[in-house]
A protein has these predicted regions:
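Short, acidic (Asp/Glu-rich) active-site segment that either coordinates a divalent metal cofactor
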Residues: 156, 169-218, 222
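Short loop/turn motifs at secondary-structure junctions
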Residues: 100-102, 197, 245, 330
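Glycine-rich phosphate/pyrophosphate-binding loop regions near the starts of catalytic domains
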Residues: 28-188
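Hydrophobic face of alpha-helices
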Residues: 23, 121-124, 195
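Glycine-/charge-enriched secondary-structure boundary and capping motifs
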Residues: 2-12, 28, 119-137, 150-157, ...
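Glycine-enriched loop-and-adjacent helix/strand subsegments that border the catalytic/binding cleft
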Residues: 20
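Short, acidic Gly/Pro/Ser/Thr-rich loop/turn segments
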Residues: 55-56, 68-71, 166-169, 190-192, ...
Length: 346
């Protein structure tokens, strides 16, 4: 009996029917992100989106792509996959709002050793939730089965977003000056950076049971705290931009304070921050203690409880914080801009 092509493909480790099943299961989640600007549905060769630039004189598209990194290992060890997609969206959309852009569309890419439809659907459920939080549409994606290249129970996740901003409203730090105020938007935890170090600190790969331990000072098990999804700041930050002049926005990711805050600073300006004013969650204290990590390395690796930093004129600081609080952000004054370069932690 002659084998069909699909049967041969299945014998090679790629289950096409599982792919079809995954798509059917994820449709209900993707539907939550659809708007009147979306044309068609899943299954096309490309995602179609009507670009509405009314009110903009010179619309500029801005794109961003990122992944979740080795935080995925925590999700795999805990067998919890319904929030990791939020992280993927957050890592992309939080970057594009640093230029003042509103995210419009999102696409995801999942590579897996074996397509388990229920697991893939759970991942996409998180991606869709992230898109809802960011106000963008999930217009497409790809799930690639990689037999022989990845273990069956492993996967990788990455995403891509496109946003739009009027050219005249692209964030410009040209007016930044000494005396301006930096505002902190709290993180939910480690977010999606530094997990290779986190795994080493707790020897998670060799002792995954540590994820069930609640350390002194923490109110939840380590695994739950580490897997808390990255916060999406799109709506509160755009709300501030709608009413005030924002001079700089920094998404605090890999490289912590020292690498990311300077990316939004004007040349000749430094961000002075009192370490005592940084509201650092207990999780970071536990990591520093358990890993014997220096304070400098902590601020040079992790967000230390601050997921995003905005810079505004001093007369706008109170109003900016009020707007952020109205959108659910427990924002606070982080520090000030002074003459110099980089970040000064005092």
């Amino acid at each position: 009996m002659e084998k069909s092509y699909s049967a041969s493909y299945a014998a090679a480790g790629v289950d096409i029917t599982a792919g079809y099943r995954s798509v059917e299961l994820m449709k209900q989640y993707v539907a939550r992100t659809m708007t009147e600007n979306c044309i068609g549905g899943l299954g096309g060769f490309g995602g179609l989106f009507v670009l509405d630039c009314s009110g903009m004189e010179h619309p500029v598209l801005i794109s961003g792509t990122d992944g979740v990194g080795t935080k995925l290992r925590i999700a795999m060890l805990l067998d919890k996959h319904d929030t990791i997609g939020i992280d993927c969206v957050a890592m992309c959309v939080n970057d594009v709002i640093c230029a003042g852009a509103k995210p419009l569309v999102f696409l995801d890419y999942i590579a897996c050793g074996k397509n388990i439809p229920e697991k893939i659907a759970e991942i996409v459920k998180g991606v869709a939730e992230g898109c809802v939080q960011a106000g963008c549409s999930l217009v497409g994606g790809e799930t690639a089965e990689h037999p022989g290249m990845m273990p069956e129970d492993e996967y990788d996740l990455a995403g891509f977003t496109v946003g739009v901003v009027d050219k005249a409203k692209i964030l410009d730090n040209s007016t930044m000056q000494a005396g301006d105020v930096t505002i902190a938007l709290p993180s939910t935890g480690v977010h999606s950076n530094g997990f290779s170090l986190v795994r080493k600190i707790f020897d998670i790969d060799n002792h995954p049971e540590v994820l069930q331990k609640t350390f002194d000072g923490m109110d939840k098990p380590l695994g739950e705290a580490l897997l808390a999804p990255t916060k999406i700041y799109v709506k509160p930050v755009l709300a501030v931009m709608d009413e005030l002049t924002v001079k700089g926005v920094s998404h605090i990711t890999g490289g912590g304070f020292y690498e990311n805050i300077p990316r939004s600073l004007k040349k000749g300006c430094a961000a002075r921050i009192a370490k005592a004013d940084v509201r650092t969650p207990a999780l970071f204290d536990v990591m520093q203690r358990e890993g014997g990590i220096s304070e400098h390395d902590m601020f040079n690796t992790f967000n230390m409880g601050v997921g995003m930093v905005l810079t505004v004129a001093p007369e706008d600081a109170d109003k900016a914080i009020a707007i952020l609080k109205a959108h659910g952000e427990d924002a606070y004054r982080l520090g000030t801009i002074v003459e110099g370069d980089g970040v000064e932690l005092v």
